[in-house]
């Protein structure tokens, strides 16, 4: 939720998981409760990722992509390590973009702001899903990015089911592909190399190679 004027707007977090994992700098916090029940962020501009992507002609530059990967990674790491929780998948507008100032060269920050797909990680490193995804309500703008194992479970239409907590890593990889080359599904190996030729052997290239592994246990969220 955003409020305010053109000069300053605010976003209010009410999810304990997202408040505790929030990757935004504390300088942007205008209010934070001691018991992690309320956090308000102040920024020059706040917008959903779909709007930011549209303004950038459906292509994010390398540095912006790197920043987004790092900030989402910080959130996922906090959820996993500090809270023993994970995310099944991401939609495009599960990510919100926060601008520190009105100029184009000011800092841009990214954060997961939808808690709907957060679940406990069990002893087998899995997340249990007990409620259905309402696929009919998904808009073409708010695209979903599902891992192969998640798509398989959705096709079965049976509840409950379980997913490895690294399902989210694959989802982030697909989201990054969409933000860079407007592809919402993983291309085959030869096309992957062609599409990513401008950034081959860079940190983001190797990051995508690691998170887009078919076997969840082989996925690594590393961008160094």
Model-derived features: positions:
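Conserved structural core of kinase catalytic domains
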Residues: 23-63
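Protein kinase catalytic-loop region centered on the HRD/HxD motif
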Residues: 73-86
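Conserved C-terminal C-lobe helix
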Residues: 199-214
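A conserved short helix/loop substructure at the end of the activation segment
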Residues: 210-224
